[in-house]
Every structure is written in C-alpha cells, then in structure tokens.
Amino acid sequence: MKIVAVRSYLQHMALTKPYSIAGYTFSDVSIAFLEVELANGIIGLGTASPAEEVVGETAEMSAVHLASDFVQNLVGRDIEDFQQLIQEARAHFDHLPGTQAAIDIALHDAYGLLVGKSVSAILGRKIQALPTSVTIGLMSIPEALAEAREFKKLGFTVLKVKTGENVEEDIEKVIRLQEIVP
C-alpha cells in the first residue's frame, strides 16, 4: 500500500499542573506530530516531544525536520517496507532522536492499522500487559503524597519518583509514598 501524503505540525498544550524535573519546571509542552496517510485513507500518527537538555533536540526542531524534503519523499513509497524506511530515517536524522521517533511511530502505526495489528503485536509481544507508571516530579512531601493519592484513585499502581534535592527528605518521601502505593 502506497504512502500518499505526509503531514507534520506542532502543537503547544498546557499541562493540567506544572511538572518539575532535573531543575526545570514545565507548565506546558510542545509536541511535533507526523501523519502518514496511505492510499486507502489510513493515517498513521507519530509524535515527538524531546527535551533539548536531554537529547539536544526540541519539538520545534523536530517539526522542522518532519517537514523536510526527506520526509516528504516518503510519499510514493510502500508502507510494507516500513522497516527499511525507518532505517533510512535513522541514518538521515542520525543525531535527532525526536525526529526519528515520530517517523518510526507513524510508520509502525500506519502499518499496524493496515494489517489490523497493534504495534506491540507487530513487535512480538510476549506478555499481555504491563502496568503503566506515572511520575511524581520534584515537590514537597505533602504535595507528593497528595499527588500519589490522586494517581492511586486513577488506578496507577506504579510510581516513578524524582529525587535529588535533599537526601533525607527524599528517603522520607519514598518511604511515605510506599505506604500509599506499595
């Protein structure tokens, strides 16, 4: 099945509440989107929201790369060759992990929708499900405990806790969080 169109765009979205990690506080997020449309109308969707401080790329940079001639040249290619297309993108965007991710995800999504399989089934899922974790950012103990209670109400059973500001406080925070979500 041929790829007939690719579209990319950038969206800025406010977070429901600020999030602090590694000395930064975020109140909104920018996400680069890539749509890969097949001849039968199926649209695969990929996204990237890289942090420049971590990988040297921003969502804005990803959006520019996703609008490049290289990505536009996916039009006319066969989605059945998605693995080859991903390898070509990895080589072309060698030091741009966000751009690579958006292309990889969009192509996997389009192919999966075409063959009626989830991406995890295409990749060879061996187990049925894993619990999804949720991250508690850098915040005070009372705030972390309140957030953990809210996450537990939402059904989360695995917490990822950001630490590093104060060792004694971090130890107390982790111990008290384990009382809420063992």
What does each model-found stretch correspond to?
Residues 1, 101, 154:
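Structured loop/turn residues at beta-strand edges in well-structured enzyme cores
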Residues 1-42, 46-55:
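Structured beta-strand/loop patches that form or line metal/cofactor-binding pockets in enzymes
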Residues 1-10, 21, 87, 112-113, ...:
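N-terminal amphipathic alpha-helix/helix-capping segment at the start of soluble metabolic enzymes
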Residues 7, 37-114:
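Metal- or metallocofactor-binding catalytic centers and their adjacent structured scaffolds
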Residues 15-17, 21-28, 56, 76, ...:
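Generic structural "secondary-structure junction" signal
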Residues 26, 96-104, 141, 145:
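Glycine-rich anion/phosphate-binding loops
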Residues 121-182:
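Metal-dependent enolase-superfamily TIM-barrel catalytic cores that perform enediolate-based chemistry
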